[in-house]
Amino acid sequence: MFGFQAAGAAPIVLGHVVEKPKTIATAIRIGNPASWAHAIKAVQESNGKIDLVTDEEIVEAYRMVAALEGIFCEPASAASVAGVIKMQKAGLFKDGETAVCTLTGHGLKDVDIAIAVSQKPATIQANMEDVVRVLGY
């Protein structure tokens, strides 16, 4: 089992309480987790790992999940995807292995982040030619 904490709020990875946790992933902006010991136990029993991901990696995964899967998750859920991407790039998965990420938080829990990291909508004329052009067909 693998777990991922935001770099600005990674007390388990760092091994100490983070007094002022900071991350865009508000649901995991925790400097002293109540289940710290349980998390360590789960990692040890599963021969897993807890690592950190940056806010930039979280945003990249957040956008990717929306664009490729049509899933509007919150940044804390995207942190798991960011972590798996990071691990895959580091060569920690063998070809053919499957990784599963649990994305339990809906994007509506953190709409301000969605607005902040989204591209500004295109303004076009109300005609088919412009619609086709903007959609890239």
Region locations from a protein language model:
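Substrate-binding/catalytic subdomain of NAD(P)-dependent oxidoreductase enzymes
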Residues: 59-63, 68-86, 97-99
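Phosphate-binding loop/pocket of nucleotide- and phosphate-handling active sites
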Residues: 82-137
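Short, active-site-adjacent cap segments at secondary-structure transitions
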Residues: 8-11, 80, 109
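Active-site/ligand-binding loops adjacent to catalytic centers
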Residues: 2-73, 117-137
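Extended hydrophobic secondary-structure segments that form protein cores and membrane-embedded regions
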Residues: 1-5, 100-103
